[in-house]
C-alpha cells in the first residue's frame, strides 16, 4: 500500500471543459484473509489501501462563463495505510466512474 501517481479529469458544469491534473493517491495490497474453517461464524473485516492524510490542491479551469467559479479543489494523498474502508469519504466499490471520466466531449 503506497502512494501512486495518477491523472484525474476535473470539470465544472459552468465551464463546459475538462482538464487533467496529476496527483498522488493510494494503491496496492493489504493483508487480508478468509479462513477455511468458519465455525463458529465470525465476520472478517477486510482492509483496503486508503489515504491516511490528504491535502487539497486547487486549479483554475479555463473557459468559464461570466462570473462562474473557475477554481476547482481536489484531494491529493500524502500518506497511505491499510484500514477498513470509510464509506463517508471513499468510494469503496468498483462502481465509480474512474479518475479520467469527463462529462463533456473533448
Curated annotation (Swiss-Prot):
Compartments (UniProt record): Secreted
GO function terms (MF aspect): follicle-stimulating hormone activity
Keywords: Disulfide bond, Glycoprotein, Hormone, Secreted
SMART domains hit by this protein: GHB
Glycosylation sites: 5, 22
Record InterPro entries: Cystine-knot_cytokine, Glyco_hormone_CN, Gonadotropin_bsu, Gonadotropin_bsu_CS
Cysteine-cysteine disulfides: 1-49, 15-64, 18-102, 26-80, 30-82, 85-92
GO cellular component: cytoplasm; extracellular space; follicle-stimulating hormone complex
Pfam families on file: Cys_knot
Example of a GO biological process term: follicle-stimulating hormone signaling pathway
Function: Together with the alpha chain CGA constitutes follitropin, the follicle-stimulating hormone, and provides its biological specificity to the hormone heterodimer. Binds FSHR, a G protein-coupled receptor, on target cells to activate downstream signaling pathways. Follitropin is involved in follicle development and spermatogenesis in reproductive organs.
Self-association and partners: Heterodimer. The active follitropin is a heterodimer composed of an alpha chain/CGA shared with other hormones and a unique beta chain/FSHB shown here.
Family, as annotated: Belongs to the glycoprotein hormones subunit beta family.
PANTHER family: FOLLITROPIN SUBUNIT BETA (PTHR11515:SF17), GLYCOPROTEIN HORMONE BETA CHAIN (PTHR11515)
Protein name: Follitropin subunit beta
Lineage: Eukaryota, Metazoa, Chordata, Craniata, Vertebrata
Amino acid at each position: 500500500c503506497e502512494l501512486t501517481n495518477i491523472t484525474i479529469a476535473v470539470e465544472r458544469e459552468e465551464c463546459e471543459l475538462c482538464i487533467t491534473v496529476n496527483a498522488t493517491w493510494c494503491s496496492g495490497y493489504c493483508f487480508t484473509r478468509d479462513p477455511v474453517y468458519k465455525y463458529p461464524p465470525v465476520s472478517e473485516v477486510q482492509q483496503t489501501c486508503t489515504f491516511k492524510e490528504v491535502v487539497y490542491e486547487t486549479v483554475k479551469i479555463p473557459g468559464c462563463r461570466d462570473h462562474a467559479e473557475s477554481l476547482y479543489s481536489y484531494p491529493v494523498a500524502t500518506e497511505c495505510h491499510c484500514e477498513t474502508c470509510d464509506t463517508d469519504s471513499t468510494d469503496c466499490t468498483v462502481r465509480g466512474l474512474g479518475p479520467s471520466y469527463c462529462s463533456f466531449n473533448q
